[in-house]
Amino acid sequence: MKASHICSYLLSIAPLVVSHGVHHNRDHGHEANHESKQSFLILKQESIFYSLVCFLQNHLFVLGPRYNAIVAILIIQLMPCLFVLFVPGLRKNDRASLTLSLLVSFSLGTLLGDILLHVIPESLSGVTDVTMVGGAIFLGFISFLTLDKTMRILSGTSNDDGSIHSHSHSHTPQQTAEKKAGFNMSAYLNVISGIAHHITDGIALATSFYSSTQVGIMTSIAVTFHEIPHELGDFAILLSSGFTFPQAIRAQAVTAFGAVVGTSIGCWMNEIGNNSHKATSSSANASELMLPFTAGGLIYIATTSVVPQILHSSAPDSKLREFKKWALQLVFIFVGFAVMALMDEH
């Protein structure tokens, strides 16, 4: 079976899991269990997936839902970090390299795809007050803008991307120290946004394991396929923003901690009141608040960090070379968006 079919199939099941685990459990407790069983019956029709899920259930996810969820989120966060080690050109840390430029373009596609195809639609799912969702997105954007501006004022810098946008070669000792340290506001904002995003993912994943082990495993596989291109794009943003390879790895580890925190919160919410509706209601409320806020932060990062890097010309004297480079960048933007569309295909 082709990889694209595998991804499409897995992700066609996962949204159902997350949907009834995070957004609809408040009103459809018995319906959720039926949906869980139905999803696993569908899985049985594909012997490869049935065998894989049974193997994982018997050899890896052998404990209760709390521990299974923690194990799953650790594996999910480890996979993208291992994946970046095999991408050529990332260790060189050359901000002008074509590889990094194309990865930044890919990250813009995945970022926009995540915002437009996943985060915002998920925020609007089952919500009657659309204005509140829009307000939360706006609040997220303004919060990241305020944080960015505050950090710039406190650090005494007016443009953290000076090496990209400025033609001046004079630097104060403070600016030189910041450059050596890989100091970049947008990169840190990307880390903060990643933490918030991973918290919501962790809550959803934990809820799926409390639905059933099989559903939790299916969700874990689907989320892994989703996270690899997403984390690869985030990694490219960090490198292009001035982080060294080890710094980017450490930053990704910090965002991974957010997923563990989110999973722990999800487990706590599901266990409160002996699996009563109170747990799933709290989980849904937390997710409804976090998702649109995260969308606002992601929009800020895309518009102030990623897009300016793509607009930057590395060889302004060669117009033909720049047009060829832009053509490749445009292709990678579409590829990134298409990957996220495939990941979120219902």
Swiss-Prot record:
The keyword Membrane applies. Residues 24-69, 121-126, 224-252, 312-322 are cytoplasmic. Keywords: Endoplasmic reticulum, Glycoprotein, Ion transport, Membrane, Transmembrane, Transmembrane helix, Transport, Zinc, Zinc transport. One of its GO terms (biological process) is zinc ion transmembrane transport. InterPro entries: ZIP. It is a multi-pass membrane protein. One of its GO terms (cellular component) is endoplasmic reticulum. Coiled coil: none annotated. Its main location: endoplasmic reticulum. The chain crosses the membrane at residues 3-23, 70-90, 100-120, 127-147, 203-223, 253-273, 291-311, 323-343. Residues 1-2, 91-99, 148-202, 274-290, 344-346 are extracellular. GO terms for molecular function: zinc ion transmembrane transporter activity. It is found in: Endoplasmic reticulum membrane. Pfam families: Zip. Glycans are attached at residues 184, 274, 285. Belongs to the ZIP transporter (TC 2.A.5) family. KE4/Catsup subfamily. Zinc transporter whose role depends on the zinc status of the cells. It helps to balance zinc levels between the cytosol and the secretory pathway. It transports zinc into the secretory pathway in a zinc-adequate environment and in a high zinc medium. In high zinc medium, transport of zinc into the secretory pathway is a way to eliminate zinc from the cytosol. Under low cytosolic zinc conditions, it removes zinc from the secretory pathway and acts as a zinc importer that helps to alleviate ER stress. This is Zinc transporter YKE4.
